[in-house]
Every structure is written in C-alpha cells, then in structure tokens.
Amino acid sequence: MKILISGGAGYIGSHTLRQFLKTNHEICVLDNLSKGSKIAIDDLQNIREFKFFEQDLSDFEGVKALFEREKFDAVVHFAASIEVFESMQNPLKYYMNNTINTTNLIQTCIQTGVSKFIFSSTAATYGEPTTPVVSENSPLAPINPYGRSKLMSEEVLRDANMAHPEFKYCILRYFNVAGACMDYKLGQRYPKATLLIKVAAECAAGKRDKLFIFGDDYDTKDGTCIRDFIHVDDISSAHLAVLDYLENNESNIFNVGYGHGFSVKEVIDAMKRVSGVDFKVELAPRRAGDPSVLISDASRIRNLTSWQPKFDDLDLICKSAFDWEKQC
C-alpha cells in the first residue's frame, strides 16, 4: 500500500512515521515544516528511504497535482494547528488550517481514488464532559475553536463517506499525548510547546525557569485539571492498528487513551521524582478553554483492533520526556 503521512515531520507524525517505516508499505511524507522538524525527517531516512514533500495543504492545486502524480492508496492526516489557548486568540487560523485544509484534502482523496483516511482528531471535541469518563458516544460539545475545528472535520469525513462509500475513514480522538520515543531518537522538538509533560521536562532539564499551574480551583481531587496522558509510541501504534482494521471493516471512530487520569500536580510530582530536580512551580489564573477532567473510555479500539498499549506508566512517560530533553 502507498501511504501519505501529512504532518509527518511533527511530534506525533514523526513517531508514527517511524513505526510505518518498519512495515512493507511505501511511505511518503508531506509537511510544510512550520512546526515540524527536518532533523527528524533526515534521521528517519536512516531506517529506509522515503519521499518527502515540503508543501502546504493550503496550496490546493499543488496538493492535487501531487496526488494525481503519486497515486496514494491511503492518507494518515496529522497536519494541523493544535494549541487550545492560541485557538481562542486566533480562531480563524484554526478553521483555515484544520477544517478548510482537511476538507480540501478529503476532496482530493476522493477525486484521486484514495480509499482509506486516518484522521488525527482530539478529545477536545467532547468539551466539558458531564461524566468523568467519555466514550465515542458521549456528547460532543467542544468549548474552544481547536476542538470545534476538529469536530467540523469529523463531520466532513462522515458526510463524504455517506456520499462515497468506497472512501473509508477512521477518526482517532487522542487524549493527552506525551513522552518521547523509547530509544530517545525522537521527541517533541517544537520550542514553544505547551503540553504539560513537555514543559515539565524542559524545566527539569534547565531549559525553562519555571512551570505555571493554570488554576487550582477546579472541581477535582487537588483543584488542578485531570487528563488521560498517553505515551506517544502507543498513540503512533494505534494508527497502524486502525489502518489494518479498515482492510475488512467499515469506517469508525476511536478514542485513544489509557482510561485513567492524573492531575497537573501529580504530573509535576512524577517529573520531579524521575528527574531528581525540584524545579520551580508557580500558580497562574485559569486558561480559557480548559475543561476540568478528560478521561477516555478506550474499550472500542482495544476490542475491535489489534492495538495493545505498552507504556501505560506515568513515571515511564515522564522519564522518556526528561531523557529526551537532556540529549536533544
């Protein structure tokens, strides 16, 4: 199978690319390198060579010409803007990059005969859940433009599939992705990251002066937000599992998480424990768009696909992130 990975130079995209390169599929990557890493792309060429296209999805005609020339069988779509707080400040950027570009990509896939589409979505589509644990059937009520832009893209996929049943998709709603590749050759390189474990690892490695806790008055056990943190290698392996699933099954939506959560304070304690560094932490006001609790019910992907997570351990996730920061 010939597979295009959009956003394959990014954090999750590059880890997924690494796993796909160990298969027999022909792999190509498209990325505009606005936040992705050419270093990661060059390093991954050492596993085996693959085509890399430095291109922006907003170049609709260029993307269509690429698809007509390369004749892909499947697309794994990561390319997106992903920062919740930024989406509150600059919503149109998110609707352009996430919803409009994804819609164009879906149209191009249908026009050029792509039959399988794996979409990188988010637990932010659930908004502020009415229950601590959310399944794929839980109400969808995103509370920020990032979540809404992803949900709109999900709806485009459903409608496209209804009109074109030969075009099948799987939507993966990620929970909080964290950590680094377990051989430490890959990690998150973006210098302005806002993900909690990444920021905590940077503090422990001396790359940041302090970590801010954004609110300690949430309705949780210690007043800080609770999230379902999942190791990036387990997220990346889920894409292989759902691509295999689509061979003999219809389109579907899957939560990808571990099914239990940790608070911001618990994550900070874990990072201090594994690093041995008592870095500075300060309290700050709540950020707009942050729900208090988000925990997955991921039983569907476990029951229907071959996905078996291997790194469900907060200390292990924190240590992998810290070790990456020390050497990158």
Mark where each language-model region is:
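N-terminal Rossmann-like NAD(P)+-binding domain of SDR-like oxidoreductases, especially those catalyzing
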Residues: 1-180
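Short-chain dehydrogenase/reductase
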Residues: 95, 143-151, 186, 190-198, ...
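Residue-level signature of the cytosolic catalytic core of signaling kinases
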Residues: 59, 189-193, 260, 310
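Short, flexible, glycine-rich and Lys/Arg-enriched loop motifs at helix boundaries
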Residues: 38, 175-196, 206-227
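Glycine-centered small-residue hotspots that permit tight backbone geometry or close packing
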Residues: 8, 36-39, 55, 79, ...
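C-terminal substrate-binding subdomain of Rossmann-fold SDR/epimerase-dehydratase oxidoreductases
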Residues: 199, 205-328
